A protein has these predicted regions:
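Right-handed parallel beta-helix
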Residues: 1-5, 22-40, 57, 63-74, ...
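Extracellular beta-strand/beta-solenoid scaffold signature
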Residues: 7-21, 44-59, 74-78, 102-110
Length: 110
């Protein structure tokens, strides 16, 4: 409960391989409840509309990740975000959020 309170541009669950092309298999994010990604907007020299706190974030070359049956609520940015990732499965996730869903359409918006 509650994350990205001091630093932002993060997630409740975050995975990344970075700039390498190393492939990891059998990675699973299943059955989690992720709440209150608040984003550290005070004391940062950016516009207040930039609130990078995501529920689940597959970033930079994350490969072979199954994201199944998770619930995400009250995140400042989106319930789920996928950036430059490959060979992933996202099914049956529910997002209760204020600002919408990233364009992967992998959550059932409530």
């Amino acid at each position: 409960d509650s994350f990205c309170m001091v630093k932002d541009d993060g997630a409740g669950i975050y995975t990344s391989t970075g700039s390498s092309n190393t492939v990891y298999y059998n990675r699973k994010i299943i059955g989690n409840i992720i709440l209150n990604g608040v984003a550290a907007k005070f004391g940062v020299d950016v516009i207040n509309s930039y609130l990078p706190a995501v529920g689940i974030y597959l970033d930079e070359n994350a490969t072979y990740v199954d994201v199944l049956n998770n619930t995400v609520a009250n995140c400042a940015k989106t319930g789920m975000n996928v950036h430059n990732s490959r060979f992933f499965t996202v099914l049956n996730n529910t997002c209760y959020i204020k600002r919408g869903i990233s364009d992967n359409r992998s959550c059932n918006k409530k």
